Amino acid sequence: MANAKLDDAVFAVEVANHQLLRLAYDSYLAASRQVGAKTKTRGEVRGGGRKPWRQKGTGRARFGSSRNPIWRGGGVTFGPSGIENYTKRLSKASKRTAIRQALSLANKSGEITVVDDFKSTGKTKDAVKLIQSSGLTDRRRILLVDNKTTEKIYATSNLANLELVSPTYLSVYHILNADAIIFTKPALEATIEWLKEDK
């Protein structure tokens, strides 16, 4: 544990309503969404190149292809194309404001802990020692470090309920989904610098 002052401009912001938080949360999830669904249109379904019957004289309705969407085995009308873009745009200023609000709520709930630093040799025991020293062993945690080195990634990758994040990649999703947020001192300084109002 370390003694560190949390800047009120970042960790004590008034949250009038949660609408912006919700927008930022949904924006993160939408950007993470993978598009897998894909259906074939009448032009993509194999076959159907020949006209089923002549245009006139049969008494039946006219059709140009057996892959017509209203036929069995035909294409799909207005189905998913596989190239949908679900991202929801949010301005940088709005994102930063939302993160400040989320951190303020976390601070108010006593979820923020500051440690001196996280020096790792790449061993899991380094991360375990840090977690035990913070007293947050059985909770969903995010650990903020100023730089994600390979050693730090190796040290934390085997631990359940722990996510390693660098300050500029911090999101409302990370904060709201965590029961505890652990800052190293350098990461705290970098976060405050990044989220300051006057940029």
Language-model features and meaning:
Residues 1-35, 80-199:
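Extended polybasic, low-complexity segments that bind anionic RNA or targeting/receptor surfaces
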Residues 36-42:
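Short coil/turn segments at secondary-structure boundaries
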Residues 42-79:
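Glycine/serine-rich anion-binding loops at beta->alpha junctions
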